[in-house]
Amino acid sequence: MDHSISPEYNFPAITRCSLSNSLPHRPPSPLPSSADIHRFYNSLSPSAPSVPVSSEMESMEAVEKILNYKFSNKSLLKEAITHTSCTDFPSYERLEFIGDSAIGLAISNYLYLTYPSLEPHDLSLLRAANVSTEKLARVSLNHGLYSFLRRNAPSLDEKVKEFSEAVGKEDDLSVSYGGLVKAPKVLADLFESLAGAVYVDVNFDLQRLWVIFRGLLEPIVTLDDLQKQPQPVSMLFKLCHKHKKRIDIKNWKDGNVSIAVIYLDDELLASGRAENKDIARLIAAKEALRKLSEVFPVEMVIDEDSVEIQLTHAKTKLNEICLKKKWPKPIYSVEEDRSSVQGKRFVCSAKIKITEEKTLYMKGDEQSKIKKAESSSAYHMIRALRKSHYL
């Protein structure tokens, strides 16, 4: 997406604490360029107070231009851009609460319709990547929303500045799992509060909310993005193996919440919490990588044929291949079912009938669960198809 703008564009000054109906249809307003964004964030100082604007209305109108939406209730917009450090007006926390849920549901609907054969596990990973603090913080950063936040917390400026500088140095702008500088939560909170404000202003119309915010969320993280990006858990194991460190990940449930805790040589390193076990592991692994990056270099690379990356999406990928080739869907069968000292072990096979006379068959590796065994057979089927030049 081209984020270039005209040379005369300037960031509006930051608002100090003391801000009719939908806009006619028009193209979205131009975004600030990367240079403009980083010039603004580099000007932030943890010791410098916020600079007042000549008019709160100008600040609010600028936000409306970014959203390409004009609020009927201006108080909602003012509330959405008021941080808790400002005490002269209700803060954005309530709107953030409803915005978080609304954006999550809107993304869920989109993914459900976009990937009709994707399994719930993979849909959860995709949704998490698109509504994570990391993703939404980058959206706020790219659209320059932080400059309009009414705040009285100079320490936030330093965190946002550090994050902005780190993002500016990245080669790949579509980072699905996040970089090594933790995204400031305030950036994601601001985006969610604006989503909540719009959602309330459109009378809780989820479809209208999605129409307004879909463009802001671009590029939306896709299944291919997740497969191509280095996966934090895999990176962590490879990194620790390289430096002869022992890594261990423990998982347990606390009510409906999954908790993942990572130990490095039996010392607590990081933890993560989420509704989904795999997402909790991702959160913990990202935090562990950030901490380890202070000790030794973390290379953001991984073998693209890594089984750990591909197994998660192998069945979905194989379904997509069959659909494209106009083959019937694969048939999975349990070939081996036995018990061992490690518990139950399974081996599954995948079959694809590509013609009346020809059926492709592939067995997978031994796994602890049937679904994983099916994914393993799908993974090996894909590799065999590549080697046999079917793909």
Curated annotation (Swiss-Prot):
GO biological process, one term: rRNA processing
One Pfam family here: dsrm
Site feature location: Important for activity: 185
Residues of the DRBM domain: 218-294, 313-387
Chief location category: nucleus
Cysteines paired by S-S bonds: 240-322
Cofactor: Mg(2+); Mn(2+)
Subunit structure: Homodimer; disulfide-linked.
Listed name of the protein: Ribonuclease 3-like protein 2
Organism field: Arabidopsis thaliana (Mouse-ear cress)
